[in-house]
């Protein structure tokens, strides 16, 4: 069985006009410009986000914890938007600080020791053209594509060995979510963290920030907006027993459980404090049958404390292939897709190949 992230990749192939799959490896542009504000002056929340992002770029815990430095950076970012009418991005902001230099001290009434320009320019140069992390801020056509997609997949597996980069990318992604999901309350958006157990432990050694605390905050915030957030884990034992895990559980309104073993069921009952015995029995009753005449899968769904049900999913052969994660079948579908250029066509061709194989076996 392949990773479930491959399923999201295959779905994005099936709906290329409505979806986007970004497998970020650090060697190509990310395609997100957090400094972009569509010609509007950024509000206080946006300014705070940009300040936090620049502080991450700066990578100095001492500066992050120095109120004077943070206030100075806030003033400079605000003045940047006042002075520069368009073309906002981090490289442009960097050049603005470089160009204005020590004149900023006088213009903004900042003491030199309250903002170390030389340190900023030296450390943050890694995010400029030619720098080690230049692709984080490099312009890309993907930026426009993201504005017009309903389903976006960010694959960060290839950079998981760089906790600092992951922390930076997550900050940028959350800003994108803020703009795409939360800014328009007429549209309900959903954020899903797949294979979350692997990523929750990642911690930025410079700022001390970790993914788990950030996601816990996201749960709390999205619950108050017209949005939803979900995390996918194999077992709750994979999550640390701390305030952030408890916060995520407390803010979980819908619980989904796939068929598992008794240990996983018992962990779920304990973590979510499920007292209703009928809910527990219902959860433990679910089964999958992929070898029958009509293959199906079952899932237990619990709506907070009030209601629980089991849903059985039977799919047509075409839809079953669209959600396929089996290694052999997935690889064959991808092979046909590369030739056909369409996942829909690949599924039909795969069915035809299977039918021919079956007819050949029957005629022997």
Where are these regions (language model features)?
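C-terminal regions of RecA-like/P-loop NTPase motor modules
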Residues: 184, 239-364
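H-loop/switch region of ABC-family ATPase nucleotide-binding domains
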Residues: 233
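P-loop NTPase motor domains
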Residues: 2-18, 22-227, 240-243, 291-294, ...
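Aromatic-lined carbohydrate-recognition surfaces of secreted/lumenal glycan-active proteins
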Residues: 236
């Amino acid at each position: 069985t392949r990773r479930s992230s491959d399923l999201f990749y295959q779905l994005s192939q099936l709906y290329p006009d409505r979806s986007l799959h970004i497998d970020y490896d650090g060697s190509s542009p990310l395609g997100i410009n957090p400094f972009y504000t569509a010609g509007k002056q950024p509000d206080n929340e946006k300014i705070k986000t940009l300040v936090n992002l620049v502080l991450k770029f700066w990578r100095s815990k001492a500066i992050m914890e120095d109120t004077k430095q943070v206030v100075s950076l806030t003033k400079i970012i605000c003045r940047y938007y006042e002075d520069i009418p368009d073309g906002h991005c981090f490289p442009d902001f960097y050049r603005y600080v470089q160009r204005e230099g020590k004149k900023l001290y006088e213009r903004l009434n900042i003491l030199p020791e309250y903002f170390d320009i030389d340190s900023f320019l030296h450390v943050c140069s890694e995010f400029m053209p030619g720098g080690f992390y230049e692709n984080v801020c490099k312009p890309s056509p993907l930026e426009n594509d993201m504005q017009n997609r309903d389903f976006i997949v960010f694959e960060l597996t290839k950079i998981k060995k760089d906790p600092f980069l992951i922390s930076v990318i997550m900050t940028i992604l959350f800003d994108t979510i803020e703009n795409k999901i939360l800014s328009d309350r007429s549209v309900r958006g959903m954020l899903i963290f797949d294979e979350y157990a692997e990523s929750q432990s990642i911690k930025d050694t410079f700022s001390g920030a970790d993914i788990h605390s950030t996601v816990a905050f996201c749960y709390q915030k999205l619950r108050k907006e017209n949005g939803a957030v979900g995390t996918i884990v194999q077992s709750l034992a994979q999550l640390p027993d701390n305030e952030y895990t408890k916060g995520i559980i407390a803010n979980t309104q819908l619980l989904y459980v796939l068929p598992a073993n008794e240990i996983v069921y018992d962990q779920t009952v304990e973590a979510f404090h499920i007292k209703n015995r009928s809910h527990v029995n219902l959860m433990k009753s679910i089964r999958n049958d992929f070898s029958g005449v009509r293959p199906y899968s079952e899932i237990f769904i619990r709506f907070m404390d009030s209601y629980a049900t089991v849903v059985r999913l039977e799919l047509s052969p075409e839809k079953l292939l669209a959600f396929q994660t089996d290694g052999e079948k997935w690889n064959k579908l991808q092979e046909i897709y590369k030739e056909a250029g369409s996942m829909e066509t690949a599924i039909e061709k795969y069915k035809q190949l299977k039918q021919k194989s079956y007819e050949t076996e029957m005629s022997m």
